[in-house]
Amino acid sequence: MISFNNNYRKLRKAIINEDIEEIKYIIEKDPNMIVKVDNNNHTLLHIAIMYRKVNAVKVLLDKGDNLVYVINSFPILPPLYCAIIGFCKLTRRNKISNALEKINNHKKIIEALVDKGVELTGLEIALSCKNIWLIKFLIEKGISVEYTGFFPVGVNYNTIDIDICKVLLENKIDINKPVCGETLVRYAIRSSDLNLLKYLISKGADIEKRNKYEQDPNIIEAVEKGNLGIVEYLIDNGISIDTVSIYNHKPAIYYAILAGHYNMVDLLLRRGANPFITCEGNTSLISVATQAKRNRLKLINLLLKYGVRLPGDHDYYIQPILLDYSYETYNIIHILLEHGLRITSNTTLVSTFLIIRV
């Protein structure tokens, strides 16, 4: 960090005014000025980028032998990021005076930075803004498409559409490799874009591909999103319906039941999901249904229809609903008792008796 001395102020002013001779003169007098960082973690190069001063950027890059090292050091925002953010903001606005000139200046600055050898970054911003020129430029220059970005915010997956995927595939990006941390199929699932999913599968996408160390299976992601069309299409194309979560080793049907998504559970069961998985306390999925956000009674009846019973610790089936004195709870308790529920805990027995009496 620096305290603003007279030379720094003069150089900053010269950059904003794009007074090239003055910039060169001050740098020659004090070469170290060029790599100093202000209280906002900005170098003078950042200032030149923010004011879109193309010639000033080029002079600073030419004069600063150590500048690339400094600007790629955390916590300083990489100047390429700074330029890309400004560029994308401009292209998303409709009414700006001299917009075309400003956009072109940003392009020239981005090109100058890349030519100087700064670390390639910002693809996730380009994708989130659907900026075709920038996506193509970064890929052509050799950016690692798997890199998730400077900030842990990821891509706005709703912007990944067929047009964006066509650009990526035309630029020789492997359809099954992660792009900014996610496969293209994963983006289609997360955005519930059935047309995109169909397009990707037609181009040879593997519907099972994902980051196995950090992400749940695609079928679980799709079920949690709740789009029946997406889930059914994945099943039609051979996705494994019973692949379990990396976090709790439960399959998609478990999550569908917990969310109370009756139609999703019905679809999964009709398409061959295993209803006989073991849950906490060696219980069945019926214990999960008693904890569902909605449709508890319907889900229990559906599971019973498929032959699911009440094994394991029977207190697990009843405990989640003991504080819910609703008519649905009354019916749930009755149907569980009819199908062999045995309550062994005195506390649970008393609470159940009170609900039935009410």
UniProtKB/Swiss-Prot annotation:
ANK repeat start-end pairs: 6-35, 40-69, 91-118, 119-147, 149-177, 180-209, 214-243, 248-277, 280-312, 316-345
SUPFAM superfamilies registered for this protein in UniProt: Ankyrin repeat
InterPro entries documented for this protein: Ankyrin_rpt (IPR002110), Ankyrin_rpt-contain_sf (IPR036770)
Listed PANTHER family: ANK_REP_REGION DOMAIN-CONTAINING PROTEIN, ANKYRIN REPEAT, PH AND SEC7 DOMAIN CONTAINING PROTEIN SECG-RELATED
Protein name: Putative ankyrin repeat protein FPV242
Sorted UniProt keywords: ANK repeat, Repeat
Pfam families per record: Ank_2, Ank_4
Naturally occurring in which organism (per UniProt): Fowlpox virus (strain NVSL)
Coiled-coil region(s): none
